[in-house]
């Protein structure tokens, strides 16, 4: 009432009587909330039958920051699914049958970096080291298989070796924008 009127006179501006911008719940806000919910429900290969509703699908070998990157993208309003790539057989049939169903991007990394990350993961979980999971030769094979799979389906790839989640997401958004232009 009087306080708003006083400020209005002091600032020589008419009061709008609307909540400030930081509290406005607009379409953008609801879009982000929907994207976050979608992304959480489609993390780590879940609900693949709904994969066609994704704006972006991330595929990658274990420990390539698929989940944190997906969550970051969701906070920007992109409905993101992520699928672990164990081998080509782990790709959902719907994606193999229609590889351009939406913007699909492969995430890859250097094998030695993956060994280090996986060993740290095993240590942090206090699990005995799974030699298959942390073996350099096995990981080299896994990374090469992933690269070949991405190439086979003509999916763009991003090497996440020395990239932060934010940098990876920025690259993904650029690819997505190009994809939408060509769509």
Could you describe each region identified by the protein language model?
Residues 81-83, 103-107, 156-158:
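Hydrophobic/aromatic beta-strand patches that form the interior of the parallel beta-sheet core
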Residues 149-183:
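NTP-dependent small-molecule kinase module
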Residues 33-80:
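Internal active-site segments that recognize and position negatively charged phosphoryl groups
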Residues 1-32, 113-117:
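Long, charge-dense
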Residues 80-91:
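Short beta-strand-centered segment that lines the nucleotide-binding/catalytic pocket of NTP-utilizing
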Residues 87-89, 110-114, 164-165:
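Conserved nucleotide-binding/hydrolysis micro-motifs of P-loop NTPases
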């Amino acid at each position: 009432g009087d306080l708003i009127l006083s400020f209005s006179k002091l600032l020589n501006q008419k009061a709008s009587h609307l909540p400030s911008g930081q509290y406005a719940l607009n379409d953008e806000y609801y879009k982000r909330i929907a994207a976050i919910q979608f992304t959480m429900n489609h993390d780590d290969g879940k609900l693949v039958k709904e994969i066609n509703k994704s704006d972006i699908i991330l595929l990658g070998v274990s420990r390539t920051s698929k989940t944190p990157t997906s969550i970051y993208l969701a906070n920007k309003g992109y409905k993101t699914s992520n699928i672990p790539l164990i081998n080509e057989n782990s790709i959902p049939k719907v994606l193999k049958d229609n590889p351009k169903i939406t913007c699909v991007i492969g995430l890859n990394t250097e094998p030695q970096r993956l060994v280090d990350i996986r060993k740290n993961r095993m240590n942090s979980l206090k699990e005995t080291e799974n030699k298959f999971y942390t073996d350099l030769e096995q990981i080299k094979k896994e990374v090469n298989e992933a690269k070949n799979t991405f190439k086979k389906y003509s999916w763009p790839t991003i090497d996440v070796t020395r990239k932060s989640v934010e940098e990876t997401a920025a690259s993904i958004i650029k690819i997505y924008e190009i994809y939408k232009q060509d769509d």
